[in-house]
Curated annotation (Swiss-Prot):
NCBIfam families referenced in this protein's UniProt entry, alphabetically: argD (TIGR00707), PRK01278.1 (NF002325), PRK03244.1 (NF002874)
Pathway: Amino-acid biosynthesis; L-arginine biosynthesis; N(2)-acetyl-L-ornithine from L-glutamate: step 4/4
Organism: Mycolicibacterium smegmatis (strain ATCC 700084 / mc(2)155) (Mycobacterium smegmatis)
Name recorded for this polypeptide: Acetylornithine aminotransferase
Residues that coordinate or bind N(2)-acetyl-L-ornithine: R132, S271
Keywords, ordered alphabetically: Amino-acid biosynthesis, Aminotransferase, Arginine biosynthesis, Cytoplasm, Isopeptide bond, Pyridoxal phosphate, Transferase, Ubl conjugation
Positions of post-translational N6-(pyridoxal phosphate)lysine modification: K243
Keyword Repeat: no
Subcellular location: Cytoplasm
Length: 390
C-alpha cells in the first residue's frame, strides 16, 4: 500500500488526499517515496526557515531532549526563559511572552487579552486569515471558512484590508482591538499600501484600542526584518507568531507590550505543551543561526532576486509579483494557480495556490541563489503547461 492509500484509510478527510508522500529532506530539497527530489519553495508553509535537517536545530533538539524533555507550565526552564528574552530583545521594547504550540493558539490568547481591556468590539480585515480555532476563525475575514461553524464569538467586524478610511470609520472608543496581518499570507500575499500600518497605529492609539499584529507568517525574518511591522517603524501592543519560530517544531508565541503584558494573571490562560524546553531550544537555535549567518538581511536581498527574476520573464500568465523578502506571491492574469501548483510539482518544484489567482512562495531562508535561478529558469515551461491545462 502507498502512503496515500494508507492516509485515506485512517486520516480525516479535511485535507483531502495529499498528492505527494515525502520521506526525507536536506536543506531546501525534499525527496518523495519514489526517490524523486523537489525544490521546496513552500517550506512547510513558511515554517522551515532553516530548511530540512539543519545541524543547529538537530543539535539543539537532541541535546535538550537528552537533558530535559517536558516539564509542563508548572516549572521554569532555561530554554523557555532564554527564548522569551531573545524575542523581547528583537521586539525592541518591554514586553511579556506567552508560549503555545501554533499560530491559531497565539491568536486565541491575543483575543483573550483584548477582552481583559473591558471592551469587546474588534475590527479585523476582510480576506484575513488568523487560524481555524473558534476565536481565530471569528477574526478570519473569509465567510466560506466561517459559515459551517457559526455562531462564532461575536462583536467582530471586518473592513477592507489596506483601506485607511474604512479602518478609521470602524474604530471608536468602544473598540478593544484591531487585528491585522502586516502582509496577508493565506489571503493571497497581499501587501497593504505604504503607510497603512502607521495609520492603524495612530487610529488605535487615538481611541485607546490595542493594535494586534498577526506575524505568524511574516515574523522571524521572512520579510527581511525580524518582524514585518519593523519595516514601518511602529510598535504594536500585541504580536503573535509561530511557523518559522521553531525551525519545524511546533511552537507559537504571543508578545504583549508594556501594561498590556500584565493583563493575563494566574488562571486566565494556559498551555500544557507551551514553552516546552525542546521546542524553545529549537527556537533559540533558529534565532542564533539567523544572526550568525545574517539570514534576515539575506532574505530581503533574495526576495528581490526572486520577484524581479519572475517579472522580467514577461510571461503572459504573470500579472505581477508582490510580497516582501522570501514571502512572495505570483499574481496571475487568470485564476489558474492550482494548475500552476500542479505543473510546478510535476517539474520538481513545490509551491502553493494561496488564492485562485495567486501562487505563494515561502522558501527556506537558506535557499541558494542557484536554486532560485533554477526555479526562474524552469518557470516559463511550468506556466505554459498550466495555461494548457486550465
Amino acid at each position: 500500500m502507498t502512503l496515500q492509500s494508507r492516509w485515506e484509510a485512517v486520516m480525516m478527510n479535511n485535507y483531502g488526499t495529499p498528492p505527494l508522500s515525502l520521506v526525507s529532506g536536506e536543506g531546501a530539497v525534499v525527496t518523495d517515496a519514489d526517490g524523486r527530489e523537489y525544490l521546496d519553495l513552500l517550506g512547510g508553509i513558511a515554517v522551515n526557515l532553516l530548511g530540512h535537517r539543519h545541524p543547529a536545530v538537530i543539535e539543539a533538539v537532541t541535546t535538550q531532549l537528552d537533558t530535559l524533555g517536558h516539564t509542563s507550565n508548572l516549572y521554569a526552564t532555561e530554554p523557555g526563559i532564554a527564548l522569551a528574552e531573545a524575542l523581547v530583545g528583537q521586539l525592541g521594547t518591554q514586553a511579556r511572552v506567552f508560549f503555545c504550540n501554533s499560530g491559531t493558539e497565539a491568536n486565541e490568547v491575543a483575543f483573550k487579552i483584548t477582552r481583559l481591556t473591558g471592551k469587546t468590539k474588534i475590527v479585523a480585515a476582510e480576506g484575513a486569515f488568523h487560524g481555524r480555532t473558534m476565536g481565530s476563525l471569528a477574526l478570519t475575514g473569509q465567510p466560506s471558512k466561517q459559515a459551517p461553524f457559526e455562531p462564532l464569538p461575536g462583536n467582530v467586524m471586518h473592513v477592507p484590508y489596506g483601506d485607511v478610511a474604512a479602518l478609521e470609520a470602524a474604530v471608536d472608543d468602544q473598540t478593544a482591538a484591531v487585528f491585522l496581518e502586516p502582509i496577508m499570507g493565506e489571503g493571497g500575499v497581499v501587501v497593504p499600501p505604504a503607510g497603512y500600518l502607521v495609520a492603524a497605529r495612530e487610529i488605535t492609539s487615538k481611541h485607546g484600542a490595542l493594535l494586534v499584529l498577526d506575524e505568524v507568517q511574516t515574523g522571524v525574518g521572512r520579510t527581511g526584518a525580524f518582524f514585518a511591522h519593523q519595516h514601518d517603524g511602529i510598535v504594536p501592543d500585541v504580536v503573535t507568531m509561530a511557523k518559522g519560530l521553531g525551525g519545524g517544531l511546533p511552537i507559537g508565541a504571543c508578545l504583549a507590550v508594556g501594561a498590556t503584558g500584565d493583563l493575563l494573571t494566574p488562571g486566565l490562560h494556559g498551555s500544557t505543551f507551551g514553552g516546552n524546553p525542546v521546542c524553545t531550544a529549537a527556537g533559540l537555535a533558529v534565532l542564533k543561526t539567523l544572526a550568525a549567518e545574517d539570514l534576515v538581511a539575506r532574505a530581503g536581498v533574495l526576495g528581490k532576486t526572486l520577484s524581479h527574476g519572475i517579472e522580467e520573464l514577461g510571461h503572459p500568465l504573470v500579472d505581477k509579483v508582490r510580497g516582501k523578502g522570501l514571502l512572495q506571491g505570483i499574481v496571475l492574469t487568470v485564476p489558474s494557480a492550482k494548475a500552476v501548483e500542479t505543473a510546478a510539482r510535476d517539474a520538481g518544484f513545490l509551491v502553493n495556490a494561496a488564492a485562485p489567482e495567486v501562487v505563494r512562495l515561502a522558501p527556506p531562508l537558506i535557499i541558494t541563489e542557484g536554486q532560485i535561478e533554477a526555479f526562474i529558469t524552469a518557470l516559463p515551461a511550468v506556466l505554459d503547461t498550466a495555461a494548457e491545462d486550465s
